[in-house]
Swiss-Prot record:
The chain crosses the membrane at residues 22-42, 60-80, 98-118, 147-167, 194-214, 224-244, 257-277, 284-303, 308-330, 351-371, 393-415, 435-455. GO terms for biological process: ATP synthesis coupled electron transport; electron transport coupled proton transport. Pfam families: Oxidored_q5_N, Proton_antipo_M. It catalyses: a ubiquinone + NADH + 5 H(+)(in) = a ubiquinol + NAD(+) + 4 H(+)(out). InterPro entries: NADH4_N, NADH_Q_OxRdtase_chainM/4, NADH_UbQ_OxRdtase, ND/Mrp_TM. Keywords: Electron transport, Membrane, Mitochondrion, NAD, Respiratory chain, Translocase, Transmembrane, Transmembrane helix, Transport, Ubiquinone. It is an enzyme of class 7 (translocase). GO terms for molecular function: NADH dehydrogenase (ubiquinone) activity; ubiquinone binding. This is NADH-ubiquinone oxidoreductase chain 4. It is a multi-pass membrane protein. Its EC number is 7.1.1.2. It comes from Dugong dugon (Dugong). The gene is MT-ND4. Belongs to the complex I subunit 4 family.
Length: 459
């Protein structure tokens, strides 16, 4: 694991020691090399996972998320270049340092063997994200968004520490490699039910569960492009990863406690998809669609079957790449139109035909068109939930209908129609932007050919 952590940490001195002209090229190329090195983690001959040391390990669940994390840093740097072009060099370097720190914390979160280390790193990701949103966001409302993000996440996750100490006292260990094989189970008392609730709440706020999702649209809309990308692609997946790790430890309790959250997720999935149909703000629409997709993942994790776990892992990776791609496309529109309102960006298909092709591909993956990896994840989850209860097909079917509706609404509003007058002086799409979109789409297409590498622990 150190072969990824050490080079990532060394990107920070590289940032500050690089000359201003070579800074972007240096860091982007080195971070690409790191992401290619991380692909070696896919070679796991044993089912038990690779135990590197007492602190870090990787298995079939954490490996895809680790690779997604390392893959996203060069893409964030490529997307941020125009946004930072007016800033001074010192500020550019501090921005890049924040992104590298965030990647470092995320790698250690996904690779942690001890739950306490996972908790510390889970909390540490809050600091760089908060700085990125409140310092480099576009509008003054970013301070409000940062506060929402901070308080929702902190209040959700502080009780988790107390719960972890309690589990340590009951089971005797918090090691993720040992704890699943421990014979002693947690007692089924009301206090343990409360502990289950505090454990899940920390991760459900991060997912986010419908009802405690209000920080997400604000944070997404106000964050700069790299902030939106990392929030949608990886920080939401922290919640899913934590839930998958902890529900296995709290096994007997999960079966009895999960019902209200399953109901809330199914309801929230339909509600947030309906909200998407009423959005005028492009980034807000993509943020609400993230809430809707993550509700599916919560349902899958709480059902606790091998199929649902496989579906949840596949959908998390697929959604990470798709939502990041949609935010990049929204940002490329924003840089030209200087507004997030969709109707102002209409008719772009005639002006930017190649960008319209990326839009079409992104929208088709978002609405889970066969044979994309998004469909494989959703299909697994729908089958697992249908075997759990037949009535879920009503929610799932309606949600798929709404997802297709709002995705096509987004595509038609931004691409079709008569171009507005101010669009005549618009810049053409840059090679940097086309490369950025291609680097999102190519992994999605490759994963559709070979999905088994991201189906997680149960495959």
């Amino acid at each position: 694991m150190l072969k990824i952590i050490m080079p990532t940490a060394m990107l920070i001195p590289l940032t500050w020691l690089s000359s201003n002209s070579t800074m972007w090229v240096n860091i982007t190329m080195h971070s690409f090399i790191i992401s290619l090195i991380s692909l070696s983690l896919l070679n796991q001959p044993l089912d038990t996972g690779l135990n590197f040391s007492l602190l870090f390990f990787s298995d079939h669940l954490s490996t895809p998320l680790l690779i997604l994390t390392t893959w996203l840093l060069p893409l964030m740097l490529m997307a941020s270049q125009h946004h930072l072009s007016q800033e001074s060099n010192t500020r550019k370097k501090s921005y890049i340092t924040m992104l590298i720190l965030l990647q470092l914390f995320l790698i250690m979160t996904f690779a942690a063997t001890e739950l306490i280390l996972l908790y510390i790193m889970f909390e540490a990701t809050l600091i760089p994200t908060m700085v990125i949103i409140t310092r480099w966001g576009n509008q003054p409302e970013r301070l409000n968004a940062g506060l929402y993000f901070l308080f929702y996440t902190l209040l959700g996750s502080i009780p988790l520490l107390i719960t972890l100490v309690s589990i340590q006292n009951t089971l005797g260990t918090l090691n993720l490699l040992i704890a699943p094989y421990w014979t002693q189970h947690l007692p089924d008392s009301w206090s343990m039910n409360l502990l289950w609730l505090t454990c899940m709440m920390a991760f459900m706020v991060k997912m986010p569960l419908y009802g405690i999702h209000l920080w997400l649209p604000k944070a997404h809309v106000e964050a700069p492009i790299a902030g939106s990308m990392v929030l949608a692609a990886i920080l939401l997946k922290l919640g899913g990863y934590g839930m998958m790790r902890i529900t296995i430890l709290l096994d007997p309790l999960t079966k009895s406690m999960a019902y209200p959250f399953l109901m809330l997720s199914l309801w929230g999935m339909v509600m947030t998809s309906s909200i998407c149909l009423r959005q005028t703000d492009l980034k807000s629409l993509i943020a609400y669609s993230s809430v809707s997709h993550m509700a599916l993942v919560i349902v899958a994790i709480l059902i606790q079957t091998p199929w649902s776990f496989m579906g949840a892992t596949a959908l998390m990776i697929a959604h990470g790449l798709t939502s990041s791609l949609l935010f990049c496309l929204a940002n490329s529109n924003y840089e030209r139109v200087h507004s997030r309102t969709m109707i102002l960006a209409r008719g772009l298909q005639t002006l930017l035909p190649l960008m319209a092709a990326w839009w079409l591909l992104a929208c088709l993956t978002n609405l889970a068109l066969p044979p994309t990896i998004n469909l494989i994840g959703e299909l697994f989850i729908i089958l697992a939930s249908f075997s759990w209860s037949n009535y879920t097909i009503l929610f799932m079917g309606f949600n798929m209908l709404l997802t297709a509706s709002y995705t096509l609404y987004m595509l038609i509003t931004t691409q079709r129609g008569k171009a507005s007058h101010h669009a005549k002086t618009m810049k053409p799409s840059f090679t940097r932007e086309n490369a950025l979109m291609a680097l999102h789409i190519i992994p999605l297409l490759l994963l559709s050919i070979n999905p088994k590498i991201i189906l997680g622990l149960m495959y």
